[in-house]
Each structure stands twice: as structure tokens, then as C-alpha cells.
Curated annotation (Swiss-Prot):
The family this protein is said to belong to: Belongs to the TRAFAC class translation factor GTPase superfamily. Classic translation factor GTPase family. IF-2 subfamily.
Coiled-coil positions: none
tr-type G domain boundaries: 10-227
InterPro entries found in the cross-reference section: EFTu-like_2, EFTU-type, P-loop_NTPase, Small_GTP-bd, T_Tr_GTP-bd_dom, TF_aIF-2_arc, TIF_IF2, TIF_IF2_dom3
Residue numbers spanned by region G3: 83-86
Name of the molecule in the record: Probable translation initiation factor IF-2
A Pfam family reported for this protein in Swiss-Prot or TrEMBL: GTP_EFTU
Presence of keyword Lipid metabolism: no
NCBIfam families: aIF-2, PRK04004.1, small_GTP
Keywords associated with the record: GTP-binding, Initiation factor, Nucleotide-binding, Protein biosynthesis
Source species of the chain: Sulfurisphaera tokodaii (strain DSM 16993 / JCM 10545 / NBRC 100140 / 7)
G1, as annotated region: 19-26
Residues reported to bind GTP: 19-26, 83-87, 137-140
Length: 602
């Protein structure tokens, strides 16, 4: 082991794969793993939990055709790919001030371009300060593309027709433009001079394998050249992060961990985050899958090892892991002082993600891990959605109480957002609280946003239905169908809106009655707006020719409270013509009430 360690100057970089749904993340990972298994020598690939290791010797074999293009002597042992692509697991690869991941592949369907989750993935990578390159996937879908039996894109592109090459260029330049809008310089990898300033776009086909050679060569070369300090191997106690907490039949609770620094040994004392605070326990077993010959074999058979060094994915069995927190750091402590130091660090980590403020009318968020909670809270903050409580674990009675308190203040935020957690046994979320459950982070945030909008729109409709809104109309001469009790006349709406039950006043502010019914082409309608000519019945102690006259202009009699609500809460529905009517109504009303609409901006 020590000889092995002496030769290990650099550890393998940790690679994650992100991107939009159906853009080929899993297919690309499968292709990389499958290709590596085909190219390996017996005993060359170590087995990992939650990750796949591709050794340098395999990268060199796959990238053989690129020797002249990329004349790099690889010093890293290989690349460690996190097996599960996407936001959910990546959010658990958290580390104070960033991520455990060293580099990311952002997978984009070259034909479709950037989609919603592509932008979200980029936002996460930017916030966690993770460098990335773009895999412009599905080049085989470009009309006229002829798949070539090679892992090299540069070899394959030479064999494509000129028009196909031009079409690919157009797709790539669209990606360059989309990245530029977000503040990233980007270009096709073979046109880049300075990789520190430009994001590399690698055209690939996860289906045929074309471009895999360049992708692996770039990942290895870039990490080795620009991250030497970060990748320097340290022969000290291990540091890691918990990817997942799992219960294994016959064994009990285990944690899947990515070790990113140092060495983990059997019987080491580890400190991890737990639901109720830091957990101090001893490693009973370090487990990895038995060696595979075929990548399709499921990694279920586990074998014990005595020690493991970074970077690696392992399963740890130890006592008291049932409350372990995914997304929490893992530290190996060598003495009491270190135990206390790490307990404090973990306590602070958990506290920095959890949140409670009784003074905020906001939603309640519950998640299954530290990483997912952090990602959801970040996403909600970007959408300006207030949070009252953010915590880890199942939904409790306290969560329901907090949501009910919010409901009293702001109906749209009476939400419990649950990410992969359910209510505790015996606890039911009442119908007046909206329970939004999802197993996908972006979906949860979308559903929360959608519900808030729906409630606001419904409240808006309800409020607007109860308000008397500004309207102005003229009695059309020659269209008097009934002179009194009720008056039925033809009118032209000059501005704003009129509706049944709206009170009506003259230009001098005197109320003359209330609109009973509106008809358009002999059909009852619930409103009439500018430009419409309709028949209106008005109930009141009035007669045409006495209190009101043909050709006269009338207004809706808007109470000051209703106008205040309209101008402060629903300004977005005020049209230009309604704005003019409001000004006229204010002038009419202020003759008798100087405080009418005082301090309100039209």
C-alpha cells in the first residue's frame, strides 16, 4: 500500500454529469463506463460504490487516435464518475464554499439546444464554482450524419459531408450564443487556445461513442493541468461527503460516501451529520462491489476492504447510522480534540442550511438530505418565494402548525413542500394546507411557483369580482327602450368597464341608480368594455328625460376603498382608457370629498 501511495502524487478528479431531462446524461455515462470495461485489462478497474472509476490506461487507449492533437502525459490515476446524473445527487456533493466535484459535463442535445434544466444546471454549477465542459450530444441525429466506427469526433467529422459539417457548426454556434448570453465564452474544443478563459464544447454521440475520446482526454487534461493543487494527494485522515443513506437487508443502515481527501481505514472514528446533530461512530466495514467483468452486471455483491484512499466511492457500515444525513460532511478524527472540532464544523454546516423565522409568512420546506434542502432553498430564493421553515426529515405536527400560521397571513404561502419525505406515521396534513411532493428538485420548485400563481390569480379574481371598477358610458340618443322602473337604454362604453350591480353617478357626482343587467345582441353578458355598444337596465328612482337624458355621459360610482385596492394591488389590469376614467372620477368625487384617492398614484 505504501508503495502505491508513494506513486500517487495526484488523486483522480471527481466528475459529475448534469443537463436537461432526455438529453442523454445516463446514456453518456453508460457509454463511458461500457467503453472503459471493453478497453480495460483484467484487474485494472477498481470497483466503487455510487461512482465509476476509469483508469488512465483506459483513457489513453480510447484516446489513442488523438496522440498528436493532445500530446499530454497523464499523471492522474484516472477519472471518477459519479454514477447518478442530475441535480438531486449532485446537490449532496456539497462542501463548504463549493462542491466535492472537480469538474462537470453539461450534457446538451445539440439539435434542441439549451432547455429549462440546462439553465438550472448552469446556475448550480456557477453557484458551487464547479468548472464544466459541454457535451453537445446526439450528433447522430443531425440529418445526413454517417456514424463511423471510432471514439474520436475529429476522425468522424472528416468523413461527414460538407453540408452536415455546416449544420453541426450552426448547432454549435447556437450553443456558443446561449452560453454567451449567460456570460460564458465558449467554442468547439478544437478551436480553443486558452482553456482557462473558454468553455469547451465537445460534439459527441452517446449512442455511437463518437466524441468519447475527446471528452475523456479533455476531462483528464484540463483537470491535471489546471487543478494540480486541488488534486494533490494527502496521506492523512479521510474527508468525504455522504451521497446516500441506505438500509441493507441483514446488515442495517449504511452510508454511501465519496472520499475526496486522505485515507479511510477500518475502525476509524468518523464524525457525520445526523438528523438530531453530529454523530460520532466507528467504521465497522468498508464495502465495495466485487470485481466485474461486464458493466451490465448489477453492483450488488459487496466485499470488505481494510482501507481506501481518495478519490473513491465506498459503502460504510457503522453503528448509529439510521439518522445519518445525506449531503453531510464525513471526517475521520484521530483524537478527542479533533472530534470536538469536527462536531462543531458539522453543527455549523447543518445550521447554515436549516432555517426558521416565525416573523415571515412563507412556505415550509422539508427534504431528505442536507444537499437537496440547500438546493431547494437556493432555488426558492432566486424565485423570491419566502420561506418560514426549512428542515430535514419527515413532516411533523410543528410543520403543519407553522404552515397554518402562514395561511392566516398569506393564503398563497400555506404550503408544505416535501422533497422525498412523507408525514410521520399518524400525522395527516389538513386539506387547507397545500402539500406539494416531488422527487425532482426543479419539479418541486415549478409546482410551488405554479400553485402560488394559481392562488394569487384566484384571489385576484375574487377580489376584482367584489370591487366596483371605474367605467364611463354614454346614453345613445334614439335608443331608449324603457324610460323608467327600470330604465332600459342603449349605451356606448367610452372607457373602463361596466358590470351588473355597479352603482352609477352623473358628472356632478349624484348617484342615479345601479346597473341591473347588460345585454349584447340580446344575450346577457357580465361586463362591457371600451368600444362596446350594449343595452343596459338601470334600477333607481329615475326617468329618462328628467333625472337623466339621451346623450348624457354617466360614470360608475367607485367607493374610495375599492379604488385604493385597485391602485395598490391590481395596477396591472388598469388599461390606458381606464386610467383616464379614474382621473375623471377622482375630479368628480373630490368636489364633495377632498380626501378621495388622496396619496394614491394613478
Amino acid at each position: 500500500m505504501s508503495q502505491q501511495l508513494q506513486s500517487r502524487r495526484l488523486r483522480q478528479p471527481i466528475v459529475v454529469v448534469l443537463g436537461h431531462v432526455d438529453h442523454g446524461k445516463t446514456t453518456l455515462l453508460d457509454k463511458i463506463r461500457g467503453t472503459a470495461v471493453v478497453k480495460k485489462e483484467p484487474g485494472e478497474m477498481t470497483q466503487e460504490v455510487g461512482a465509476s472509476f476509469v483508469p488512465t490506461s483506459v483513457i489513453e487507449k480510447i484516446a489513442e487516435p488523438l496522440k498528436k492533437t493532445f500530446p499530454i502525459k497523464l499523471e492522474i490515476p484516472g477519472l471518477l464518475f459519479i454514477d447518478t446524473p442530475g441535480h438531486e445527487l449532485f446537490s449532496n456533493l456539497r462542501r463548504r464554499g463549493g462542491s466535492v466535484a472537480d469538474i462537470a459535463i453539461l450534457v446538451v442535445d445539440v439539435v434542441e439546444g439549451f432547455q429549462k434544466q440546462t439553465y438550472e444546471s448552469l446556475e448550480i454549477l456557477r453557484s458551487r464554482k464547479v468548472p464544466f465542459l459541454v457535451a453537445a450530444n446526439k450528433i447522430d441525429r443531425i440529418p445526413g450524419w454517417k456514424p463511423i466506427d471510432t471514439y474520436s469526433f475529429l476522425e468522424s467529422i472528416k468523413s461527414q459531408r460538407k453540408d452536415v459539417q455546416t449544420q453541426l457548426d450552426n448547432y454549435v454556434y447556437r450553443l456558443v450564443g446561449q452560453l454567451a448570453e449567460l456570460g460564458f465564452n465558449a467554442d468547439r474544443f478544437d478551436r480553443i487556445r486558452d482553456f482557462t478563459k473558454t468553455v469547451a464544447i465537445v460534439p459527441v454521440s452517446a449512442k455511437t461513442g463518437e466524441g468519447i475520446a475527446e471528452l475523456l482526454a479533455l476531462l483528464a487534461g484540463l483537470t491535471q493541468n489546471y487543478m494540480k493543487t486541488k488534486l494533490r494527494f494527502a496521506e492523512g485522515p479521510a474527508k468525504g461527503v455522504i451521497l446516500e443513506v441506505k438500509e441493507l437487508q441483514g446488515l442495517g443502515y449504511t452510508i454511501d460516501v465519496i472520499i475526496y481527501d486522505g485515507i479511510l481505514k477500518k475502525n476509524d472514528t468518523i464524525i457525520i451529520g445526523g438528523l438530531n446533530g453530529p454523530i460520532v461512530t466507528k467504521v465497522r466495514s468498508i464495502l465495495v462491489p466485487k470485481p466485474l467483468q461486464d458493466i451490465k452486471v448489477v453492483k450488488t455483491d459487496l466485499t470488505q476492504i481494510d482501507e481506501v484512499y481518495a478519490a473513491a466511492g465506498v459503502k460504510i457500515y457503522a453503528p448509529e447510522l439510521e439518522n445519518a444525513l445525506a449531503g453531510s460532511p464525513l471526517f475521520v478524527a484521530e483524537n478527542e480534540q479533533q472530534i470536538e472540532e469536527y462536531k462543531k464544523i458539522i453543527q455549523e454546516e447543518i445550521a447554515s442550511v436549516k432555517y426558521y423565522n416565525a416573523n415571515i409568512a412563507g412556505i415550509v420546506v422539508k427534504a431528505d438530505s442536507l444537499g437537496s434542502l440547500e438546493a431547494i432553498v437556493e432555488g426558492l430564493k432566486q424565485k423570491n418565494i419566502p420561506i418560514r421553515l426549512a428542515d430535514i426529515g419527515p413532516i411533523t405536527k410543528k410543520d403543519i402548525t407553522e404552515a397554518e400560521l402562514t395561511l392566516q397571513e398569506a393564503k398563497e404561502y400555506g404550503i408544505i413542500a416535501a422533497f422525498r419525505v412523507k408525514p410521520l406515521q399518524g400525522i395527516e396534513v389538513p386539506n387547507n394546507i397545500k402539500l406539494i411532493y416531488s422527487e425532482i428538485i426543479y419539479q418541486l420548485i415549478d409546482d410551488i411557483e405554479k400553485y402560488i400563481t394559481e392562488v394569487r390569480e384566484s384571489e385576484k379574481r375574487r377580489t376584482l369580482d367584489s370591487l366596483i371598477l371605474p367605467g364611463k358610458f354614454r346614453l345613445i340618443p334614439g335608443y331608449v327602450f324603457r324610460r323608467s322602473d327600470p330604465v332600459i337604454v342603449g349605451v356606448e362604453v367610452l372607457g373602463g368597464i361596466i358590470r351588473p350591480k355597479f352603482p352609477v353617478m352623473k358628472k356632478d357626482g349624484k348617484r342615479v341608480g345601479e346597473i341591473l343587467q347588460i345585454q349584447d345582441n340580446k344575450k346577457s353578458v357580465d361586463r362591457a368594455t371600451k368600444g362596446m355598444e350594449v343595452a343596459v337596465s338601470i334600477k333607481g328612482n329615475i326617468m329618462v328625460g328628467r333625472q337623466i337624458d339621451e346623450g348624457e355621459i354617466l360614470y360608475t360610482d367607485v367607493p374610495k376603498e375599492d379604488l385604493e385596492i385597485l391602485l395598490t394591488k391590481y395596477k396591472d389590469i388598469i388599461t390606458d382608457d381606464m386610467k383616464e376614467v379614474i382621473k375623471e372620477i377622482i375630479n368628480i368625487k373630490r368636489v364633495n370629498d377632498p380626501t378621495y384617492a388622496l396619496g394614491l398614484k394613478v
